[in-house]
């Protein structure tokens, strides 16, 4: 829903959609205030100064990959007496233009999040390079493999809630689902009149 306004969100809700993603804190705040009963996901770049606003409205933050952001989320969530669900963003493809930690750093960040009483790591997120569905599938299978490794490392109690793989967008969601995605981000396919696969 990051490219549309409140009226379009209302139409989507009437059609049965209840999960929406925003990449700007001010848009998250506006739309979550209009529809507080819906599930609001933050999918944008996390900035320290915006974390209190994001935590106030997001059910899940998809784009966490720095330890100091985890600590800031812990502080903001504690003030709200809330446990904030997060995904660790991993840059599987190694593209410099993409956010996310290196795959080798993901487990350490999950453990940092597990050590915070008001942060709950729910899984991993990645974005694939655009334009090549074969490379996209390789990216997604790489994240799925890392996800399984981390679940084994963190043990049974914590792996019960570490269940989500957020990957795949409007142009490559089929490859993501084939690789094991539990969440896909398909706003353009839903909201854009000009989108074609």
Where are these regions (language model features)?
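Conserved alpha/beta-domain cores
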Residues: 1-171, 179, 191
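Divalent-metal-activated hydrolytic enzyme cores
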Residues: 182-184, 189
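Short, charged, intrinsically disordered terminal tails
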Residues: 193-196
